[in-house]
Amino acid sequence: MGTSTATISTAAWADDHTPRIAILGAGPTGLGAGYRLKELGYKNFQLFDRHEYVGGLAHSFTDAQGFTWDIGGHVMFSHYSYYDRVFDALMGEEYTLNNRESWVRMFDRWVPYPFQNNIRYLPKEAAFECMSGLIKAQNGKGKIASPTLARNFGEFIDAVFGEGIAKHFMRPYNYKVWAYEPEAMNKQWIGERVAVLDVDRALKNVMLGTDDFGWGPNNQFKFPLRGGTGEFYRRFGPALGLGKSGGECHVNLRKRVVSIDLERKVLSFSDGTAEHYDILISTMPLDVLCNSVLRGDVPAGVKSAAAGLKHSSGYMVGIGLRSRAPGAGTPDTKSWMYFPESNCPFYRVTYLSNYSPHMTPDRANYYSLLCETSESPAKPTRGDNGRDTEAMIEETIVGLENAGLLEPGERKNIVSRWCYYADYSYPTPSVERDEILTQVIPFLESHDIYSRGRFGMWKYEVSNTDHTLMQGVECVNRLLLGEPETTIGMTYQITQDGREAAVHERSAQAGSGEKRLSKPAAAQTPVPQTRAANLGVTADGVEVQVPGVARVVVRPRAAGAVLAA
């Protein structure tokens, strides 16, 4: 997959009378959209973010003790040649290349990830439970006869992995990650995120005692040499004119939008200022956009649908320590680790100090652990919705001791305690999510609002930083060049044995390519006329059913037309 990198060499998009494009959010999606607009020579756009920095959830912080922390365990691996080229253009050679070393902590031992391919590391009784359940499931004798019959992620787990693996790892771990039971989630999101099982491979690993470490697209990953993950995204700021004056600057920080007038197309900010737009690319959470920010004739059905989206919050707790001996550095070579058991609050811990020699004040004498804990109405924590981060830090330290990551007495070596609370951490791929998107996204696009990104599109399966950056790029390609948005249209087809293949389709929710800004006739690019799977295609556009609205037709723009300023 990928995207066109063709640019327009003429001044076709430089005219001040072109439609004004506003972008809300300077995370990967917004930055990707802005970067692509500038690359295409389009000048009439502005990007707004409520923070004093760019990067969104991909930002990094350096604390007073000199430790650098990410908002979660980010690594940089890419599905896109375009993303790779942008990374190379902005970062040059200033990155490290790391081999992934992932483990699962359970039964007081370390099991190589993926757990389901390394059952031989378990106690014999648990290993037997896992293999027996797996064989039954793969022969259609488990709780669910086939993955194709599974109605949700919980049933998918039972159908593919069997009772043993479900009991010991898949169910407890996924509850800790998502903060919802697997039955509340759909099965379509899985794709590359979960390693499904080849029963012969699993049996061979058990019988022959072989290890199986190689699954996944991120076996090897890049990481910025300095500044954490956020350094890559920080560099988009200067590329988009941050710090410059006049029309050269396209980035506006400390700008929190409080309302969006649908009819007048006006953004109102908390500082009392307002901005007109013709086209809006929004990356704010979709439920917030529809229920708290939009002003105007928003159907009750759209509001109630968006309110039904689920998400989890998250605590990112950083623990910086002196090394166990002078010059000893990080005590382990592991990259990150998974924790399905209940003796610790976190689901994942990362040795950030292994990613780059500059993540601590002194690589030889300090190391760092980043711990992630989820929270939702279905899974409350001592953190109490971010109101008591000190309680979460203390519980995290106790959990590190319970899990064996901190040795007895090592607590005294802690020199940094950092915590970031993300109210919106994971967009839950709930059972009802896709139906909600089918109701909400077309309504927004009928008003020239393109909701994209991790929480703008609410598709966790395409919410890695490369995916989300490309959502912004592809949205611009759609608007200016008439190209389809392949990332948000990605689906996974589940086969009889539970294996899946990524399929790039024209999305039923958005990205059907039918709507774009018109270019001057000399530079026109034909618009693909592909039928969207679940939408009625009429002579005058794409007809969608939106609760509370009799008929919404998303119409293509006439050749040569531009929106009125």
Residue ranges and their predicted role:
Residues 13, 19-47:
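N-terminal Rossmann-like FAD-binding beta1-loop-alpha1 element of flavoenzymes
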Residues 7, 11, 430-565:
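C-terminal lid/capping helical subdomain adjacent to the catalytic/cofactor pocket in oxidative enzymes
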Residues 29, 53, 287:
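Conserved Rossmann-like nucleotide-cofactor binding loop
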Residues 38-62:
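Glycine-rich FAD pyrophosphate-binding loop
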Residues 277-279, 283-450, 457-461, 467-470, ...:
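C-terminal segments that line or cap access tunnels to active or ligand-binding sites in enzymes
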Residues 119-120, 126-127, 131-263, 276, ...:
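Active-site/ligand-binding neighborhood in enzyme catalytic cores
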